[in-house]
Amino acid sequence: EGHAGGSGHARLNRARNRHADYYRDRHFKSFPVDAMHPWQSANKQFHNQQAAMERLAAETSGVDDGVGEIMATLRRLGLDENTIVVYAADQGWMGGQNGIWGMGDHTKPFGAHELMMQIPLLFRQPGRISAGRTCDYLVSNYDFLPSVLHHLGLGERIPGRPRLPGRDFSAVLAGRTADWDNVIYYEMEDTRAIRTDRWKYVARHPSGPFELYDMKADPQERFNLYGQPGTEPSRADAAARLAAFFSTYADPRFDRWNGGRNAARLQAP
């Protein structure tokens, strides 16, 4: 039934797994009840709905069961000690935070809120990756390929063309520190964003709306500081870095800022 939470009106039906009864009539602190964000364009019928919360919680726990089955199968086949296991996702999900239910393309304009961008990224490889460690570096999906290839001793397999934006965090997997610029870049069709330790800046083609958040003072992204007095130097620096990144790495065919078309056509071309 598609991504987490099912699809269509199925999200208001009970999940068909062993967790459905456990979550029935539960109060979910992780799903805040808030006024609907004016940009919410899809999933409006699920907003603040107990049934939708129960469904998403049960299906998330169902994913945990699936991971357990995979690990049990690796153990049964004698492969669990020499297999690198990576748990990741393609995108995040907002469960009522900021008044939004869903992913980045469930708002118009497309969103770049923190929970839309955050994904799990867990590695397991006994003997080579120490268990129980966490890392506070800002990393992105585009860092995955060079990091894993270097970790496996296959760094020479990294393609030279097209030029890739990914960085190598394999040192972190080995328990060392890495020379790391703590910044990530994000794009979904007409929406682009840069996230640093301190700031998140969001730009949209062709003329906004724009967003600027102080992620230290406002981690829940409640107060858009774009255009506010005193923030112009931070905005200008973020905008310049964002433009430089995509001028280097964007595929010209899909570079909306320079005449390209939308890659997935989730919104008007």
PLM features: residue spans?
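Beta-strand elements within well-structured catalytic alpha/beta cores of enzymes
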Residues: 4, 56-63, 67, 84-89, ...
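Surface-exposed alpha-helical segments enriched in charged/polar residues
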Residues: 68, 72, 240-243
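C-terminal cap/loop subdomain of S1 sulfatases and analogous C-terminal strand-loop tails that border
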Residues: 93-105, 137-145, 149-215, 220, ...
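Catalytic-site neighborhoods of secreted/periplasmic enzymes
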Residues: 1-5, 11-14, 106-108, 182
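Active-site rim elements
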Residues: 45-60, 107-109, 128-139, 152-160, ...
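Flexible, surface-exposed loop/gating regions in the mature catalytic domains
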Residues: 35, 47, 52-57, 100, ...
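Long, internal low-complexity/basic segments
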Residues: 3-9, 15-28, 32-51, 59, ...
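Histidine-centered active-site microenvironments of extracellular/periplasmic hydrolases
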Residues: 72-128, 140
